[in-house]
Each structure stands twice: as C-alpha cells, then as structure tokens.
A protein has these predicted regions:
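Short N-terminal targeting/anchoring amphipathic segment
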Residues: 9, 24-45, 54-64
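A short, basic/aromatic alpha-helical/loop segment that forms part
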Residues: 140, 168-175, 188, 202
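Conserved donor-binding/catalytic core segment of Leloir-type glycosyltransferases
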Residues: 151, 157-173, 179-183, 194
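Conserved donor-binding loops in enzymes that form glycosidic bonds
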Residues: 134-135, 165-170, 198, 221-222
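Nucleotide-activated donor-binding/catalytic signature segment of Leloir-type glycosyltransferases, i.e.
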Residues: 186-190, 197, 203-226
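A conserved catalytic-core segment of Leloir-type glycosyltransferases
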Residues: 1-27
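Acceptor-binding helix/loop patch of EC 2.4 sugar-transfer enzymes
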Residues: 2-8, 31, 59-93, 139
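Donor nucleotide-sugar binding/catalytic pocket of nucleotide-sugar-dependent glycosyltransferases
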Residues: 85-149, 219-221
C-alpha cells in the first residue's frame, strides 16, 4: 500500500479494511488486547478498529498520526477539494473523520500537527490530541564504535566528513528537490554525502545517482539498524 502508484494505493486502502477485519476474526478471534495501536497511512481501518474495540471493550485505542491524509495529497497536487478529484478527496476526508472519532487518543508527530488537527477537526475533543513523535531518545553509551570499520564496510572516504540523509522516499519527501541539492554538491571533493532509504520515488533518485556517477555521493537502499 505504501510503495505503489497512486491508483493502486487508493484502491488498496479501500480494500485493506476488509482484509484486516477478516484476518483479525480468523487469527485473533480469541485474543484479548489491552491497547489497540494503529498508524496512518492508511486511514481506512475504522471498521477494523470498531470491531477490535467491540471485542475488547476495556482496550484503549491509540492513533499514531504520521500522515495527515488526504490533506497532504492536496498539498502535493495529487487531489483537489473540488472537481472530480474532489470527490475522491471528500471520500477519504470522511474516512479520516471517522478514524478520529473512533480513536481514544491521537498522537501527532509535532506541535504544529497537533495544532492543525485541533483547528481543522473541531468536533474532536482537543484533549485527546497530543504529541507522540516518530523518534526516540538516543541513549549515551560508552561502547566503543569502530567508525573506521564502518567507513571501510560501506566504501566511504576515511578522512572526509560524511553527511547522511535517511528515511522514506515518497512524494511528500520532495525527492526532486533532494536531487537538485545533490546536483549542487556532486563535484565537491572536501566531503561526502550518503543517502539511505526506500519508497515510491527511490527509483527516480537511483536513476539520477547512477547517471551522475559522482564520487561524492553514495546511495543505499537499506542499512542495518545496528
């Protein structure tokens, strides 16, 4: 659903709800939950959440709001509020409101997102909307890290400073802008740039990197967490 084209993604989100509910009944029918945790995308799991809450009346439902959809699709020009695309927007906007209503708490990625959700959804109790950033505190450690070994492992220059960009590579991340930034630094010899990630726009970035043949840029599809 998250790494497909726009049409397939939209159709997939519509049918995903039915598939999830069917799987929940089949494999977790006798399991009881204390917390029902789910994230966006997708926003089309309202019936699944309702069913899970009916089976687990004392469970708390918590929405991790990573994407504010469909508004982000409007911002990217993929949908419009009016016209034919507006029909699609209104369908998903209704789904979004339903998902908010069934959630006991809504965790947003930033204070700005909290403010946006509260302002554009006045029917929601503002007290249930809070910050739940998609990150964690990095613990200080005395463990010795073999930085030289890491650079050799990934064929990175030993003496140069390395700048790293990592994460999802989809439409919202503005990969064309990232490419423009890389164009501006591709001939630098005093530093090195590492790009790591995956998503619907990865191929576009990979094609450019291969064509640029820059010694200052390294692109990785995936790296181990440790």
């Amino acid at each position: 659903v998250t790494k497909t084209n726009v049409v397939e993604k939209g159709v997939g989100q519509v049918f995903l709800e039915y598939q999830f509910k069917k799987a929940l009944k089949k494999y977790f029918g006798t399991v009881r939950f204390d917390v029902i945790l789910y994230s966006t995308p997708p926003i089309t799991l309202t019936r699944v959440i309702k069913y899970a809450k009916q089976c687990n009346p004392s469970a708390m439902s918590y929405l991790l709001l990573k994407d504010i959809f469909p508004q982000n699709a409007v911002d990217l020009g993929m949908l419009t509020i009016r016209g034919l695309k507006g029909v699609v927007y209104k369908f998903f906007r209704r789904k979004e409101k339903e998902l908010y209503r069934v959630s006991d708490f809504i965790g947003c990625m930033s204070p700005a997102n909290v403010k946006y959700v509260r302002e554009h959804n006045p029917a929601i109790n503002p007290g249930i909307v809070e910050i739940a950033p998609n990150s964690f505190e990095v613990l200080s450690t005395r463990e010795k890290i073999d930085w030289l070994g890491i650079r050799k492992k990934y064929n990175l220059p030993i003496e140069k400073p390395v700048f790293i960009y990592g994460g999802n590579m989809g439409k919202p991340q503005g990969i064309p802008f990232l490419i423009e930034c890389l164009k501006a630094v591709k001939d630098r010899e005093d530093c090195h740039f590492v790009v790591v990630g995956n998503g619907t726009e990865y191929l576009k970035l990979e094609t450019w990197v291969n064509g640029a043949n820059s010694k200052a840029i390294s692109l990785f599809h995936h790296l181990e967490r440790e």
